[in-house]
Amino acid sequence: MSSPKKIVIASRESQLALWQANFIRGRLLELYPQTDITILGMTTKGDQILDVSLSKIGGKGLFIKELELALEDGRADIAVHSMKDVPMIVPSGFTLAAITEREDPRDAFVSNDFSSLEELPAGSVVGTSSLRRESQLRARFPHLQVRPLRGNVQTRLRKLDEGEYSAIILAAAGLKRLELGYRISMLLPPELSLPAVGQGALGIECRDNDPDMVEWMKPLHHAATACCVEAERAMSRMLGGSCQVPLGGFAEIFEDVLTLRGFVATPDGSRMIADKLCGKPESGEQVGQQLAQNLKAHGAEEILAALA
């Protein structure tokens, strides 16, 4: 198969999104050195509305709709997303051509004065952007105050440095990609803060009527990561996962066994239903669906109905 002549990559214009797009561009140039590969930077609604939490303005799909429009009208050939921002059902006309190898999937505790959540005194203000993190914090550390925190990585760090928060919780992957890993006070184990579905992985989206482009992206696909992310997304899909639902899902493969952990909680953390399930890596979707059923049977159905 011949190499592509040109590839236009649609990306959000935040520093992290552009890092991710440039990372994919670099990988593609290694594969196709003669190809003209450019980045089309775009500002999305999710980037523009910063004074309201994502759960109240329509969820993370706001970060990718404009990029999909660029694919649809031919301005771009592929779009690069954080998998945790990709809606559980990919719209008709598009396909995820590749899911890249996962960076660190954990959440990171960042503070200038404290080295762990356990050290924070009662009443300390912790900033976070997601209901998932908020519900887990409220459940495990009810003596802390949890407040919304929006904006790009640098904006969030600046708000911490200006004293608005005692600590903030961010995805470790973003900090590491931007060479800000030194800001991490503690990496939170999944037992303390279960990651978001797809956290740490990148997805490459194409038009589904462009089979050549889909084929050209295949070398970037990481099968083990994809198995894990597919299990997480299958669970979330069955639970109606969105920014309005506090849920987490994280799968890992060890010695050819996929272990998926998931939880659903009330936003205030007063109720949390958690479980895990093991299966074959190639059966990730079925493992995810079954874990979702188990969570529903144990009480998640009630929580979801109350949030609907």
From Swiss-Prot:
Coiled coil: none annotated. One of its GO terms (cellular component) is cytoplasm. It comes from the Bacteria. Binds 1 dipyrromethane group covalently. Its EC number is 2.5.1.61. The modification S-(dipyrrolylmethanemethyl)cysteine is found at C243. Keywords: Porphyrin biosynthesis, Transferase. It catalyses: 4 porphobilinogen + H2O = hydroxymethylbilane + 4 NH4(+). GO terms for biological process: protoporphyrinogen IX biosynthetic process. Pathway: Porphyrin-containing compound metabolism; protoporphyrin-IX biosynthesis; coproporphyrinogen-III from 5-aminolevulinate: step 2/4. Its cofactor is dipyrromethane. One of its GO terms (molecular function) is hydroxymethylbilane synthase activity. The porphobilinogen subunits are added to the dipyrromethane group. Monomer. PANTHER family: PORPHOBILINOGEN DEAMINASE (PTHR11557:SF0). Tetrapolymerization of the monopyrrole PBG into the hydroxymethylbilane pre-uroporphyrinogen in several discrete steps. Belongs to the HMBS family. This is Porphobilinogen deaminase. It comes from Nitrosomonas europaea (strain ATCC 19718 / CIP 103999 / KCTC 2705 / NBRC 14298).
